[in-house]
């Protein structure tokens, strides 16, 4: 995406950029892999698609309406042709001031749009003055005398009438250059005809642009939301002044400061309006973070605790000092957090040891900015987010989309870091905004969504209001299937609640891009086949959508994220995995082993929700591990948190005999870190966690290399053990490290976790229903360790044993024939005698 000339978009950021700093890499933020403008823009509708697809200017311009003759004559005469008597008469009423753009050197030189902040402020003052005059005096009517006087002046001038009108006024759009002398003063001042002013896009300076009715300038299409006729910056002030306030439901309380007006829409276009814009870089930013607690209308008994890695109690910090940025941190209401967590833990159906526990849970941080252009995002904002999280996260992947400007970052980091972010979010947000050279300083008001916490950072900290929004936020219950083969079309089913609302939009993000897809709702009374299975689902309580993605990259593997957005805000996110064909086939078997079958609920949607929750943490960790890291992430490959994640995954796979997936993980480890680097590590003096990591890698390679022998041993173990070992550990139960790898138990995973100091359980990413609890595997589906069964003979001993068994069977058969059928001995011996005599004679 090309940056605007001169880098003007980043100049108003509060002086955070030094003069000697090199030019930012505009096209690379958080490894977005930006190829063109379409990669960052979602399919907003047929209108916007048509704009970008058809560059022909003539097809985009509507037919030009002809101006009325009376108005044309009156406007053509202009104020310059009024006689002194008419000017004296008009002095009694307010006379419109001359547009300052007519004396702007940038504007007269043809640099449109011109970047003059002082001119914009003067134009805004004129607009406010015009509106105030209209409200006080009502609709003004043009005096008849003015028209007659103008006409008389024009007629009286005779041949010299051209001296009172502009010599030549044409539209500024190349290829149009329509005569605008007969149009109203607005169009003459801005040098634009009616067709170009109402066109969806025109070609100006080699770029498709659209005319902004508020600015009087042409902007690039990215500065507009959907089919709006005003740019985002002007639309915020315009809507604050012209729109009526919404109803009491979903708005801020009446005592909120008049400078801002928040609607109930947590993510729609333009719900945050600024009235007073003051972007002087010398002024210290005064902000406030108001408490916004979401009371979501969820199904009865829904478990909000499982929606994100953290859910802390609300904490308020009020500071009215004008020299510092003030905040008040709040957390979304987690109704019955401790009770629900206790109930879930004590449930006989929920066995935490039978599920995968991630050492680095994945969460979501979203920034909603209002005065940013996606093309102007600097690369160093990635480093600023890293510093904000106090420690380098294990994984970080970001996505940008319009709608103001929304930056969504999916972060995987250790549990203790999520706890720290939850306990002290207010101060961390404060440090993010007020950090030296902060790119968010001076950018006005914006939102920050940290998992289920929503922060409103305002520009003026004079008023602090705590508000409780009564909204029904969208909720995704499950996505089926949860993994797809790379390079193949993706067809999935999405089930949720409160999804089909105004401004509905489905989002599928993968590898730094939002994937273009088709989404349609399947009516509740319809019966459809689930993808990948012949199971029929008939659901009348939940909303079901079908998402189809026709193309995907063949050589790109990793996690993808499914979200839904509507007028009530952004839903929870559900991860899916894009991998190789071999990995997808193995995940199907692992899914059956982890979940098995459950008779707890007869509802198909509830049953699929139960099955998916056991796989979410496992899937997203595999996705991060097989994903090719960026250049900035190579320096973090051997960090403590990253090594612990590799150990956690290999330990789980070894304990449960998932050898095929273990082979994929080992190959991915060799490709990412490199076998040469691993061999060099073994020669040096290492820390305990690195030693443990190398021990698991060695054990995993031995198991993969001896897989044929290991598979035969496992088949014998499963057949001989059956149900005769009731005391054997179930699937996923931890066994001592010395038994599985032969290393000392003092280097166990949890003993090396110096940061947290205790076992970390992976909180689920989605907000599950109460019945969405991990189910037991069937008792017959046991994956036993080789150490649990006695040693079985192998190699040469097996061949000798087989030969002995065959010879014994032949001898027994011969003895039975001689004893019980003596008259048959001659019949059976005749062929043998002939065969032996034939061989002897030859």
UniProtKB/Swiss-Prot annotation:
Q: Where is the composition biased (Gly residues)?
A: 1-18, 146-162
* Tissues showing expression: Ubiquitous.
| Amino acids binding Zn(2+) 2 | 212, 215, 219, 231
Report biased composition (Low complexity) as residue ranges.
69-85
Q: What are the protein's GO molecular function terms?
A: DNA binding; zinc ion binding
* GO CC annotation terms, alphabetical: nucleus
Source domain of life is Eukaryota
Zinc fingers (SBP-type): give the ranges: 168-245
PROSITE patterns of this UniProt entry? ZF_SBP (PS51141)
Q: What is its main location?
A: nucleus
Give me the ranges of the annotated region Disordered: 1-22, 59-97, 140-168, 236-256
> Does the entry feature the keyword Protein biosynthesis, yes or no?
no
Q: Which InterPro entries match?
A: SBP-like, SBP_dom, SBP_sf
Record keywords = DNA-binding, Metal-binding, Nucleus, Transcription, Transcription regulation, Zinc, Zinc-finger
Q: Where does Zn(2+) 1 bind?
A: 171, 176, 193, 196
Protein localization: Nucleus
| PANTHER family per record | SQUAMOSA PROMOTER-BINDING-LIKE PROTEIN 4, SQUAMOSA PROMOTER-BINDING-LIKE PROTEIN 7
Return the protein name.
Answer: Squamosa promoter-binding-like protein 9
């Amino acid at each position: 995406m090309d940056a605007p000339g001169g880098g003007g978009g980043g100049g108003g950021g509060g002086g955070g950029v030094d003069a000697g700093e090199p030019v930012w890499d505009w096209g690379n933020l958080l490894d977005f892999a930006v190829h063109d403008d379409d990669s960052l823009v979602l399919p907003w509708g047929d209108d916007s698609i048509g704009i970008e697809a058809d560059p022909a200017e003539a097809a985009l311009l509507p037919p030009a309406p002809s101006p009325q003759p009376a108005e044309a004559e009156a406007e053509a005469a202009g104020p310059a042709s009024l006689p002194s008597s008419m000017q004296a008469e008009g002095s009694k009423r307010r006379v419109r001031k001359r547009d300052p753009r007519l004396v702007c050197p940038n504007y007269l030189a043809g640099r449109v749009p011109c970047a003059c902040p002082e001119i914009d402020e003067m134009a805004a003052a004129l607009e406010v003055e015009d509106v105030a005059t209209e409200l006080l005096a009502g609709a003004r009517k043009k005096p008849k005398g003015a028209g007659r006087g103008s006409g008389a002046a024009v007629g009286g001038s005779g041949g010299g009438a051209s001296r009172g009108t502009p010599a030549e006024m044409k539209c500024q759009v190349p290829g149009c250059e329509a005569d605008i002398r007969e149009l109203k003063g607005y169009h003459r001042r801005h040098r634009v005809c009616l067709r170009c002013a109402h066109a969806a896009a025109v070609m100006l300076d080699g770029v498709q642009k659209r005319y902004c009715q508020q600015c009087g300038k042409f902007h690039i299409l990215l500065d507009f939301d959907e089919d709006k006729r005003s740019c985002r910056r002007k639309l915020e002030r315009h809507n604050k002044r012209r729109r009526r306030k919404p109803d009491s439901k979903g708005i801020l309380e009446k005592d909120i400061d008049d400078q801002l007006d928040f609607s109930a829409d947590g993510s729609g276009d333009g719900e945050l309006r600024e009235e007073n814009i003051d972007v002087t870089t010398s002024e210290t930013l005064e902000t406030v973070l108001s408490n916004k607690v979401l009371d979501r209308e969820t199904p009865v008994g829904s478990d909000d605790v499982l929606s994100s890695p953290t859910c802390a109690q609300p904490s308020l910090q009020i500071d009215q000092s004008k020299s510092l940025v003030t905040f008040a941190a709040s957390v979304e209401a987690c109704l019955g957090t401790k009770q629900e967590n206790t109930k879930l833990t004590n449930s006989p159906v929920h066995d935490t040891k039978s599920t995968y526990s991630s050492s680095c849970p994945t969460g979501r941080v979203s920034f909603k900015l209002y005065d940013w252009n996606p093309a102007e995002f600097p690369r160093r904002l990635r480093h600023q987010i890293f510093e904000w999280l106090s420690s380098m996260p294990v994984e970080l992947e970001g996505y940008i989309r319009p709608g103001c400007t929304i930056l969504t970052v999916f972060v995987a980091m250790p549990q203790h870091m999520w706890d720290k972010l939850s306990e002290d979010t207010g101060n961390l947000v404060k440090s993010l905004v007020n950090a030296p050279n902060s790119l968010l300083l001076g950018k006005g008001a914006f939102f920050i969504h940290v998992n289920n916490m929503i922060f409103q950072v305002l520009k003026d900290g004079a008023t602090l209001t705590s508000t409780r929004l009564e909204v029904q936020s969208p909720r995704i219950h499950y996505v089926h299937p949860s993994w797809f083969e790379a390079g193949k079309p993706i067809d999935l089913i999405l089930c949720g609640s409160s999804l089909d609302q105004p401004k509905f939009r489905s989002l599928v993000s993968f590898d730094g891009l939002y994937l273009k897809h088709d989404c349609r709702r399947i009516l509740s009374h319809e019966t459809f086949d689930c993808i990948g299975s012949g199971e029929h689902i008939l659901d009348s309580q939940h909303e079901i959508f079908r998402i189809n993605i026709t193309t995907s990259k063949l050589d790109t593997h990793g996690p993808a994220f499914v979200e839904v957005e509507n007028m009530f805000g952004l839903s929870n996110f559900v991860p899916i995995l894009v991998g190789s064909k071999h990995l997808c086939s193995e995940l199907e078997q692992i899914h059956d082993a982890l979940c098995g079958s459950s008779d707890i609920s007869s509802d198909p949607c509830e049953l699929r929700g139960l099955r998916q929750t056991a796989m979410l943490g496992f899937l997203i960790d595999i996705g991060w591990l097989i994903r090719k890291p960026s250049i900035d992430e190579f320096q973090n490959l051997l960090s403590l948190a990253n090594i612990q994640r590799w150990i956690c995954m290999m330990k789980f796979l070894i304990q449960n005999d998932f050898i095929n997936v273990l082979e994929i993980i080992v190959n991915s480890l060799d490709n990412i870190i490199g076998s040469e680097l691993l061999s060099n590590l073994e020669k040096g003096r290492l820390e305990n966690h690195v030693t443990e990591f190398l021990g698991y890698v060695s054990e995993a390679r031995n198991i993969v290399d001896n897989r044929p022998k290991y598979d035969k041993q496992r088949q014998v173990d499963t057949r001989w053990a059956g149900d005769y070992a009731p005391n054997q550990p179930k699937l996923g139960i931890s066994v001592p490290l010395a038994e599985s790898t032969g290393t000392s138990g003092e280097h166990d995973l949890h003993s090396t976790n110096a940061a947290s100091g205790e076992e970390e359980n992976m909180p689920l990413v989605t907000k599950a229903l109460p019945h969405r609890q991990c189910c037991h595997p069937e008792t017959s589906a046991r994956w036993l360790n080789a150490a649990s069964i006695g040693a079985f003979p192998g190699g040469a001993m097996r061949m000798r044993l087989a030969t002995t068994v065959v010879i014994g069977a032949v001898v027994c058969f011969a003895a039975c024939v001689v004893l019980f059928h003596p008259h048959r001995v001659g019949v059976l011996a005749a062929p043998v005698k002939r065969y032996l005599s034939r061989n002897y004679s030859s």
